[in-house]
């Protein structure tokens, strides 16, 4: 018997999302206009809370859908205007170009990145050194590339290796289902569990590595570019200004990586079983024998393009998104990718998040029009200049650990810049606050998958169920990093940032502040 029209519509609404989630969103959409009529300020804060809720529930439904519905309603009922949304989008065009073109550009360099991580995995036998290598490699790559792409590459390596061993363990060849362990011999299951633990720890080290590297440069994370633009910094300026906080944090993060592996704390320390290593080595040897001269040329070309990418970013030869577009053109032209559909695949990872970021800007427009953060900013600005840095860092960190850090960073840098333009703070203090906002947004956000887009991408990937990486396990494994990164970042903001910035200014490394 066919279902009713009403039931069919309910099932279509937000698809496979739970009924309670659908009902919650409907309640939000119904009550918002009435609360806005009664008290616009309260309605604005309620909208922000609802939007953060959709980000926190990203595993139930991709936030673009519910967040987009809330944003559309906000424009319709007058919480902001379509014109203001357009202004916010136009002001942040560089960030949208970064997401569209840079992520797609790196897609065409995946062969090189896969080659690098495969060599690391099979060449280094010490688990501690291997973990450190993955963390450092992810940090370095994320300083110049998009963290999402770096994690996507490491996921590709892990899924590939897991599939190779799973096929051998199940003896089912190409018909093997990686999610089905029923055909695996009992003596293989123990080895498989150990292999899963090994991959889990490597993925977490790589994920944290993207955060450690991503906070250091203006292209490491999308919000970095927003903050850099607000402060008028180029690539070198941004790196130097962040370094009093980010360099000590990087060192302590790498020491944490070594410590948890050595002590086998928080689910770390599992080594690669020799049986698995033998299988993977055989597969890699066969792959290398099959590699043609044409394939080798592709790797060389991608390496040269990588050098161009780093050089262009460091010298600020063009806007970041346009450099990404040049990578797409060079990589496709010189490696023979000419089919439109093959090129189109490069954009599938970035465009949903680009659309979500546009929705972010709609909510930011509401925050500006309704003056939602005015009380918080006034509270912070009443404190001494020294205390302001700590408060901005902590407020950013708290929100970023439960919500998306791009959203949080955008809000706070806009408010800080408005305070400077209104004469509430000096240019010198604003630039210090920009560092506190950037580090506060990036470092504590490793606490949960909600804060870091790369972590959320890992959690929702095809790899997570294979290696038994759940939300709770991810939070638990991230805990030592969360504690160390947050506390070291706070101490550096509190004690090192202002004197180090002053010293660099006097040494002529930074432009003299007016």
From Swiss-Prot:
Localization (cell): Cell inner membrane
The species this protein was found in: Salmonella paratyphi A (strain AKU_12601)
One GO CC term on file: plasma membrane
Catalytic activity: 2 Na(+)(in) + 3 H(+)(out) = 2 Na(+)(out) + 3 H(+)(in)
Any Pfam family: NhaB
Biological role stated in the UniProt entry: Na(+)/H(+) antiporter that extrudes sodium in exchange for external protons.
NCBIfam families registered for this protein in UniProt: NhaB, PRK09547.1
Record HAMAP family: NhaB
The keyword Nucleus belongs to this UniProt entry's keyword annotation: no
TM annotation in the entry: 23-43, 63-83, 97-117, 120-140, 144-164, 202-222, 238-258, 303-323, 357-377, 391-411, 447-467, 475-495
Membrane topology: Multi-pass membrane protein
Coiled-coil regions listed in the entry: none
Keyword tags: Antiport, Cell inner membrane, Cell membrane, Ion transport, Membrane, Sodium, Sodium transport, Transmembrane, Transmembrane helix, Transport
One of the record's GO molecular function terms: sodium:proton antiporter activity
Taxonomy, superkingdom: Bacteria
Lineage: Bacteria, Pseudomonadati, Pseudomonadota, Gammaproteobacteria, Enterobacterales
Protein name stated in the entry: Na(+)/H(+) antiporter NhaB
Keyword Membrane: yes
Family: Belongs to the NhaB Na(+)/H(+) (TC 2.A.34) antiporter family.
């Amino acid at each position: 018997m066919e279902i009713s029209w009403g039931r069919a519509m309910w099932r279509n609404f937000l698809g496979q999302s739970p009924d309670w989630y659908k009902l919650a969103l409907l309640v939000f959409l119904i009550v918002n206009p009435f609360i806005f009529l009664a008290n616009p300020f309260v309605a604005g804060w309620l909208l922000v809370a609802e939007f953060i809720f959709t980000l926190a529930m990203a595993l139930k439904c991709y936030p673009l859908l519910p967040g987009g519905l809330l944003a559309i309603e906000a424009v319709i009922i007058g919480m902001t205007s379509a014109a203001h949304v357009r202004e916010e989008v136009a002001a942040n065009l560089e960030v949208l170009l970064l997401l569209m073109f840079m992520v797609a550009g790196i897609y065409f360099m995946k062969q090189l990145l896969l080659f690098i991580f495969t060599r690391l995995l099979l060449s280094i036998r010490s688990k501690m050194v291997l973990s450190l290598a993955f963390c450092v490699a992810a940090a370095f790559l994320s300083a110049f590339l998009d963290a999402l792409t770096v994690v996507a590459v490491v996921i590709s390596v892990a899924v590939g290796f897991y599939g190779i061993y799973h096929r051998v363990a199940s003896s089912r060849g190409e018909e093997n289902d990686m999610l089905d362990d029923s055909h695996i011999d009992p003596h293989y299951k123990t080895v498989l569990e150990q292999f899963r633990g090994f991959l889990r720890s490597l993925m977490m080290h790589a994920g944290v590595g993207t955060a450690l590297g991503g906070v250091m440069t203006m292209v490491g994370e999308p919000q970095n570019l927003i903050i850099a633009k607000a402060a008028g910094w180029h690539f070198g300026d941004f790196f130097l200004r962040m370094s009093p906080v980010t360099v000590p944090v990087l060192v302590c993060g790498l020491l944490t990586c070594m410590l948890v592996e050595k002590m086998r704390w928080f689910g770390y320390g599992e080594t690669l079983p020799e049986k698995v290593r033998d299988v993977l080595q055989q597969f890699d040897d066969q792959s290398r024998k099959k590699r043609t001269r044409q394939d080798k040329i592709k790797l060389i070309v991608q390496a040269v393009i990588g050098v161009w990418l780093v050089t262009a970013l460091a010298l600020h030869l063009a806007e970041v998104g346009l450099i990404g577009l040049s990578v797409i053109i060079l990589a496709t032209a010189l490696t023979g990718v000419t089919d439109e559909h093959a090129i189109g695949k490069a954009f599938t990872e970035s465009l949903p998040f680009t659309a979500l970021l546009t929705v972010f800007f709609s909510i930011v427009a509401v925050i500006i029009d309704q003056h939602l953060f005015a009380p918080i900013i006034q509270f912070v600005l009443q404190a001494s200049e020294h205390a302001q840095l700590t408060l901005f860092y902590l407020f950013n960190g708290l929100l970023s650990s439960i919500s998306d850090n791009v959203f949080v960073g955008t809000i706070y840098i806009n408010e800080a810049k408005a305070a400077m333009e209104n004469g509430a703070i000096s240019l010198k203090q604003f630039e210090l606050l920009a560092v506190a906002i950037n580090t506060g947004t990036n470092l504590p956000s490793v606490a949960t998958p909600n804060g870091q887009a790369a972590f959320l991408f890992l959690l929702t990937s095809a790899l997570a169920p294979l290696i038994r990486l759940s939300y709770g396990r991810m939070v638990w494994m991230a805990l030592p990093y969360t504690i160390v990164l947050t506390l070291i970042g706070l101490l550096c903001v509190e004690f090192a940032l202002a004197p180090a910035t002053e010293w660099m200014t006097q040494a002529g490394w930074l432009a003299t502040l007016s």
